[in-house]
Swiss-Prot record:
It comes from Salmonella typhimurium (strain LT2 / SGSC1412 / ATCC 700720). Its EC number is 1.6.5.2. The keyword Ribonucleoprotein does not apply. Belongs to the WrbA family. FMN binds at residues 10-15, 78-80, 113-118, 133. Substrate binds at W98. NAD(+) binds at Y12. This is NAD(P)H dehydrogenase (quinone). It is an enzyme of class 1 (oxidoreductase). InterPro entries: Flavodoxin/NO_synth, Flavoprotein-like_sf, Flavoprotein_WrbA-like, FMN_Rdtase-like_dom, NQO.
Amino acid sequence: MAKILVLYYSMYGHIETMAHAVAEGAKKVDGAEVIIKRVPETMPPEIFAKAGGKTQNAPVATPQELADYDAIIFGTPTRFGNMSGQMRTFLDQTGGLWASGSLYGKLGSVFSSTGTGGGQEQTITSTWTTLAHHGMVIVPIGYAAQELFDVSQVRGGTPYGATTIAGGDGSRQPSQEELSIARYQGEYVAGLAVKLNG
């Protein structure tokens, strides 16, 4: 049995929706145990509420528990071409795991969301830097998801990982094509984890 963690931060629900699609794909793989968790909110509650933040139901992860998983699929919105501050704060607490080599050889993959598309690939690849310092095996999705070739509509999705475009005001929700790419990412990573650890 390979243990897969889908770990995310979502303020307005776009990444939360994508996380559930990633988990849905991962659960298709026999021998994969899939868990969804989120990183803690760092914003004061009154500011979070005033900004229109969406309450999340997923349990909150601790940095130490990352060592318990064979693969971790990280989801984060873009903040100026980087991961969100909440995800950064969480990962900055993994120094003990780094010192002990606890994440070395584990699979790591990333999905993201942006307002208008700017920064989606940069967010994924800049997150990879942290995973590389931990010695994780970085798993992009390539172009195996056929939806990546569809240019008939506005759509997120990259060979680096699934993405969604929320629109400048956040009103656009993940499309079926974007969710399909997210499901593919989950299934692909889980399949590799089972082959390596199952």
